[in-house]
Swiss-Prot record:
Tissue distribution of the protein: Highly expressed by the mesenteries. Moderately expressed by the pharynx. Weakly expressed by the gonad and pedal disk. No expression in tentacle.
Role according to the record: Peptide with both antimicrobial and neurotoxin activities. Cationic AMP with antimicrobial activity against both Gram-positive bacteria (B.subtilis) and Gram-negative bacteria (E.coli and S.enterica). Shows no significant antimicrobial activity against bacteria S.aureus and P.aeruginosa, as well as the fungus C.albicans. In vivo, induces reversible paralytic activity towards the shrimp P.paucidens. May act by impairing sodium or potassium channels in the prey.
Any Pfam family matching the protein: Defensin_4
Positions of disulphide bridges: C6-C30
Record bears the keyword Protein biosynthesis: no
Protein name: Crassicorin-II
InterPro entries, per database record: BDS_K_chnl_tox, Myo_ane_neurotoxin_sf
Primary localization: secreted
Family: Belongs to the sea anemone type 3 (BDS) potassium channel toxin family.
Length: 34
């Protein structure tokens, strides 16, 4: 299963903005895509 957490947007494998702080470039990091 996917393990998604919100982190500052830095990479390629980052998806979505749901449940992430707004206005700070946060995205979901899904480890399952690495």
């Amino acid at each position: 299963g996917a393990s998604c957490d919100c982190h500052p947007f830095k990479g390629t494998y980052w998806f979505g903005t749901s449940n992430c702080p707004s206005g700070h470039g946060y995205r979901k990091k899904c480890d399952s895509f690495f």
